[in-house]
A protein has these predicted regions:
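Short, intrinsically disordered, charge-balanced linker/junction segments flanking boundaries
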Residues: 232-235
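Binuclear metal-dependent hydrolase catalytic cores
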Residues: 2-230
Length: 235
């Protein structure tokens, strides 16, 4: 048997050995690959690359009708390096992750009105923020009269899950005092007027009335930071 043939057999033997070992350790390999993918996804943070200013991104722009190519309404706003979201439709929390926007650092959610497609991602986004973030209080969710009922409903729906995850991960990862969300309710202002909801480090967030009959109440939001403003009206 010549040297070339011996090398081929040796290479074949090594390849076969790798396949055997890989197959026998497939569960551990898959778990490790998934963990690497998750770590890379959650460590991606586009905010670090942004300059100080007011930045806006669409994390969803679909309708209530199911679509494989659209997600529920969601607008991300970053000001002074902090992330806020207006409306949180289905799949929008995952879109934020894919886009590199740090859900774990989410400072607050603003809801324009209570149509299902504008709120049905709230449970997912508050859980991702809780498990991945470093907060000691629940996620603030701003909305007009009625937001208390919406937030209470989501918190109740996820209450058992909070207990399971806290028991599994412990207080270091999932402290119960930061679980879920906290409603920040306000009365819809009269037409032509605004109500100030946030004033922090140069950022001002105000709510104003919009018409979306028969939905009532319905509001829009204006974010102002460093002489720049963005207005989000919902539907």
């Amino acid at each position: 048997m010549g040297p070339k043939v011996k090398k081929r057999y040796a290479a074949l033997f090594i390849a076969l050995l790798i396949l055997i070992v890989g197959y026998s350790q497939r569960d551990q390999l898959v778990t490790r690959l998934l963990q690497v993918g998750i770590d890379r996804q959650f460590s991606s943070n586009i905010v670090d690359a942004l300059g100080d200013g007011l930045h806006v991104a669409l994390c969803g722009a679909g309708s209530p009708l199911p679509s494989p190519t659209a997600s529920g309404p969601c607008v991300a706003v970053i000001a002074n390096g902090e992330l806020y979201v207006v409306d949180v439709g289905s799949n929008s929390p995952r879109n934020l992750g894919r886009m590199g926007w740090p859900v774990a650092a989410l400072e607050g959610v603003f809801i324009t009105h209570f149509h299902s497609d504008h709120i049905d991602g709230l449970g997912e986004i508050m859980t991702l923020r809780w498990a991945g973030g470093d907060f000691d209080t629940p996620l603030p969710v701003y909305g007009p009269t009625g937001i208390d009922r919406v937030v209470a409903g989501f918190n109740e729906a996820y209450a058992l899950d909070f207990g399971y995850r806290q028991a599994h991960h412990g207080d270091a990862v999932t402290p119960l005092n930061a679980a879920g969300s906290q409603a920040v309710s306000f009365i819809k202002p009269p037409a032509g007027e605004t109500v100030k909801l946030v004033e922090k480090d140069g950022l001002v967030v105000e709510a104003f009335a919009v018409t979306h009959a028969p939905v009532e109440p319905a509001v829009g939001y204006r974010f102002t930071y460093k002489d720049r403003s963005v207005v989000i009206t919902g539907d």
